[in-house]
Amino acid sequence: MVNFSRKRPAVSSLFSQQQAIEQSLNWQALQPDLVIQDFPLEPVNFWALQPNATQGIDLFLRHPTRSLLMMKVGEPVEYAELLQNFISQNHHKVRSIFGVNYVIEQGDSFSFPHVYTEPAKSLDDNFASQGEALSALYCDQFQLFGSFRIHPRSQDIQLVPGLVHKANGGVLILSAATLLSQFDLWGRLKQILQTQTFDWYSAHPFKNLPCDIPSYALNLKVIVLGNRTELATLAELEENLYSFADYAEIESYISVAEVEEQKTWAGYVQQMAQEQNIELDFLALNKLYQLLVRESENRFLINASPLKLKEILQDASTFTEKTALSAVDFEGIFQQKLAQYGFLKEQTYADILNEQVYVETQGEIVGQINGLSVIEYPGTPVCFGEPSRISCIVQFGDGEVIDVERKNELAGNIHGKGMMIAQACLSNILDLPSQLPFSASLVFEQSYGEIDGDSASLAIFCVLVSALADLPLPQHIAITGSIDQFGLVHSVGGVNDKIEGFFTICQRRGLTGKQGVIIPMTTIQQLSLSDDVKSAVKNGEFFIYPVEDIYQACELLFGRDLLDENKDYTEKTESLSRLIQRRIEGRADSERKSFWHFFRS
């Protein structure tokens, strides 16, 4: 049988495995753990997680003149009922009657109808209210402002109260999306809030009301819920919005950096679990925390969404058909979801393993490095990590670095920025008196869709150095990280997915005990890796190397210093800058010889 597999290059002799192991992360650092000691804890409600929001709401409701609060939330449908209940429970007023009673004396063929008001005395009066909190995430002008109706035969008139009347004396909760989709509502609502008076208007711009209808005073406060984009759009349309409106936000992510914050969050989880008739032990709570850290990419911040937490608890309980959940149960539903959503990911990995997409995980190659990327497919709820081969070829030229993706409009602006930073960093580090006498072309091999982001700038820098110094890079090490012009390595997103993507390819090909990834030191707090990765690191089969700057990255990849440090170098340990300088000098000598040869001939 013919073997069509590519020949794998020999393993690098320059990469010091023992030196690298000493710089790799310990397996205990790969998953975060809660530090609370007491469990179970006293259950707390959602608003215990939102001290800033509760204080803002309280100040708004007690303020004598403020009538509009813009509140940033994740999804209005998720928080409207919570907010309505919070206001009803914590700002309950003595039951009193607000509003008026409209008395209508119907007209006849000889007279117009006559309408007048009298103070409301009971809730049976047509425009009476009790000052309650009401919410309506969708409404039209008739539902919001009420309506004026005329019977088609008798011509009798009827006044129908709207939400602004029913919430008189209390709070009305609306969505920014409704106001943006029907922006004509906003002008009238603003007038009502600023004047605290309700005036009747005809619904038809070319028809007048058949009779005068007296206005009446309102005592109304409105809270508008919306995400940041919706509130920003509304603020653009209403330039002076925050001259008369207040602002607060329900935090999408809450801090769990301190022990007391972890206790508060744990108490909230217990409250939610009790509402679903679910029991949790401490290990289950800790696993839930680890899964939420994967989503937030920060072990000190986790998602505060009640809907998200409720879904996770219900999914785990439904999947296991149990009400007493353990850590194994949460891991089980997590793995089931990965499999359920994982068709495209598995096809992508299969292409790499079948060498339809060429990614090397052993040996060493000049001018090639494995970068780490995150793939997102529209219409799917998850993303996943994938190694991508970045290659660089240099030739004599004028110093231009050609970004093939950018030239073919397959890369975004942030990618272009990262590419230019990598070039500037290299020139700054080498301290060249003039531009390089080389040109280079950089390619993300077998990449056919649009790419963006600067998380490959560290990989781009290293592959440029490899090509210029004519030194090979180890293919069993993948790398991610963004850099600045001074060579510092900065944080990137999706680090868990990136690590697990490269690990999966290495694991399915067979772990050699040398494979690993280089990540920014600052991303350690993002780590919440799978048990498989944790086990492989613990057994010395896979390594994760955090770096702070390009010097550490180059030392790991090449086994050499990037710059001369007044050491006694041998041919095998000569610094990278000296190798590049020697190549530049060789180019200059070649040009001089060509020049004299031209005149002698």
UniProtKB/Swiss-Prot annotation:
Give the source's domain of life in one word.
Bacteria
* Any one Pfam family match given in the protein's UniProt record, by short name: AAA_32
The record's annotation in PROSITE patterns points to:
LON_PROTEOLYTIC, LON_SER
User: What are its GO biological-process terms?
Assistant: protein catabolic process; proteolysis
GO MF terms listed in the record are: ATP binding; ATP-dependent peptidase activity; serine-type endopeptidase activity
| InterPro entries linked | AAA_32 (IPR041699), Lon_proteolytic (IPR008269), Lon_Prtase (IPR027065), P-loop_NTPase (IPR027417), Peptidase_S16_AS (IPR008268), Ribosomal_Su5_D2-typ_SF (IPR020568), Ribsml_uS5_D2-typ_fold_subgr (IPR014721)
EC number per UniProt: 3.4.21.-
Record-annotated Lon proteolytic domain positions? 363-560
Q: Which SUPFAM superfamilies match?
A: Ribosomal protein S5 domain 2-like
Keywords, alphabetical: Hydrolase, Protease, Serine protease
Entry annotated with the keyword Protease: yes
State whether keyword Protease applies. yes
Residue numbers annotated as active site: 455, 498
Recorded domain comment: Lacks the ATP-binding domain.
The cross-references to PANTHER family, in alphabetical order and at most eight, read:
ATP DEPENDENT LON PROTEASE FAMILY MEMBER (PTHR10046)
Family statement drawn from the similarity comment of this UniProt entry? Belongs to the peptidase S16 family.
The protein, known as: Putative Lon protease homolog
State the organism named in the record: Haemophilus influenzae (strain ATCC 51907 / DSM 11121 / KW20 / Rd)
